[in-house]
Amino acid sequence: MKMRARLLIPVVLWLCSVGQLPHTASAAGSEAPTALTYVTFNLFHGGAFSGLGGNAYDLDERLEIVAEELRTLQADIVGLQEASRGRERGDVAARLAARLGFHYVYAPANPRLFASDGLSRAIASLLGFEEGPAILSRFPVVAWHAYELPRCGRLIESRSLLSAMLATPWGPLRAFSAHTSGDPCQTRRVAEIVRAGQGPLPGVLMGDFNAVEESPAIAAFTRDAGLIDAYRTANPGRPGLTVWQRIEEANPTVQRRVDYILVTPGAAVEGRVASSRLVLNTPRSLRDGKTLWPSDHYGVAAEIEVSRVRAAAHVARRPETTAALPQSLVRFR
């Protein structure tokens, strides 16, 4: 009996090392698919000059609302846009990740304001403000890379795509977050990068693309690159409007759909969209009676299936890099 107990100890330790599974995970050995909950959300930083004040546009209160709803949703992976960092407000993505107990990675976009890197850094430092995309994850981030996107003729507006490799119990999973200008020359580049990084599991792009779904910018994803629009797949007849919510207005003011979760099928797992809906789309009443929305954007959530059966060849064991790189991130192209 003692010998059998000793043999079981390594098995128990390995199971503990895998960490918390998503709330939708099936039991070990089950053929039922596992769904991960993705959320994309533009946090609304308030503009470059908002860095001069820490709690601009009630940022602290809005972050509490966001953290509470993400916990309620039991989100697994969150793509943020307009994740800001400044002298007064700190690192907003880090603050939100800490509230959730998540891993995170962030890549600033705005220091590259001009062709001159020195001038760009000087202005960003003077304002005490930077912003860019971020990815928050229940699973460890073992590698990441920030891609500078083409300016498409815009002289002082820089945009970037953030890519993160996550170590999950089903194998390495790639997630992306981006905030583009609405120009198809940027979304074509994003689509090219996302498709080039195809692995056995589905890749998921989360972003504010400043473009409606009938536009050439979104067609570059869905029509040309074959990415799957999660919300539209699950809600064929709903408008799904996400932007221009006045954050202190009592009633909804959104007018356009510009926030998307897009899926590129994996080589072994298709990544079926189980469901998708708008989230972070209701206001709160503060103690002083003021109405406050989480952002000027609504969020989008999607449950995307990862089938253990089809991916069985890739999930025999947890990636070894998880233990080797708990804090040190490796950039990749």
What are these language model-derived features?
Residues 83-172, 277:
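Structured beta-strand-rich core segments of catalytic domains in phosphoester-bond hydrolases
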Residues 2-8, 14-102, 106-119, 126, ...:
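N-terminal, active-site-proximal structural segment of metallo-dependent hydrolase catalytic domains
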Residues 36-43, 66-89, 136, 164, ...:
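Active-site beta-strand/loop signature of hydrolases that rely on acidic residues for catalysis
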Residues 148, 184, 195-203, 211-333:
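Metal-dependent phosphoester-hydrolase catalytic domains
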Residues 43-46, 83-87, 110-113, 141-142, ...:
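Solvent-exposed loop/turn segments at secondary-structure junctions
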Residues 61, 65-68, 91, 95, ...:
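Extracytoplasmic/secreted proteins, especially bacterial periplasmic and envelope-associated proteins
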Residues 71-75, 97-101, 105, 141, ...:
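Sec-exported extracytoplasmic/periplasmic mature domains
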Residues 30-33, 72, 96-98, 126-129, ...:
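Extracellular/periplasmic catalytic domains that process cell-envelope and extracellular macromolecules
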